Amino acid sequence: LDPTNVGVLKVFAGITPVSAGGDSIGGTIIAQSRAPEFAPAGQSITKGELGAFYRGNNQARGANVSVMYATDAFNISYSGSTSKADNYTAGADFKTYDFTGRAGHNLPRNEVGSTAYDTRNQTIGLAFKSDNHLFQAKLGFQDMPFQLYPNQRMDMLDNTQRSVNLRYAGQFDWGSLDARAYQEKVDHFMDFGADKRYWYGMGSMVAGSSVASQPCAPISSTCAAGMPMLTEGKTSGVSVKGDVTLGQHDVLRVGGEMQQY
């Protein structure tokens, strides 16, 4: 979920309610996208938003756009964003060396390696409202060419995510009902990025160096081309929950969820 699309952010510290997951350790953070907006009866509204940012330290830059058209019963929207940054730099040198472990690839002593990233997000949404009933459908696409991690041995060098979300929300005399169905497909690739050693084994070591590596061949017990990890995942699920009003101060909350990985 892109930050510009966040509508509500809830934080549960410590014990988490079952309705919010219930299986968290230490707490739960729930991020909800913006609720669809509808026009007054007999009217229509059109909205748009443009945004951009730039930060000098790591040349971080990004932009976002959103457009929306709605009547009193229909809403269609699109949002897109992009964000990219290079490695960031510290206030002064914090290393006594320039090498990264890869022959010929050095970093300035004040540069924090493996902190760069590049990501793009797009979402299309449809919503229909009839009295106290709401139907929503969302298509999402995320393309992340790389996300480097300074505190991990591996980096994410490609990630593509496609998602479909359907939702029904209704208000009744007895309470409320919320039902969802969703599917997410992810193509994920991790390996060592440019700021980490990429080739392993005796056959890859630079002569006279104990820290630098170089390309080697053929791949064998003495030559390893990094540690590529390709993952293809699909998650599908449905959830239903209802709040039954028992009295002025009492609510019975029931629900169920089924998920397949």
For the regions a language model picked out, list residue spans one by one:
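A beta-strand signature from Gram-negative outer-membrane beta-barrel systems
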Residues: 3-49
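Membrane-embedded beta-strand positions in outer-membrane beta-barrel channels/transporters
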Residues: 8, 13, 28, 47-51, ...
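Outer-membrane beta-barrel strand-turn architecture
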Residues: 70-73, 127-132, 170-174, 243-248
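Solvent-exposed loop segments that connect transmembrane elements
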Residues: 90-112, 191-228
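Flexible loop and strand-edge segments within Gram-negative outer membrane beta-barrel domains
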Residues: 115-119, 132-177, 185-206, 224-232
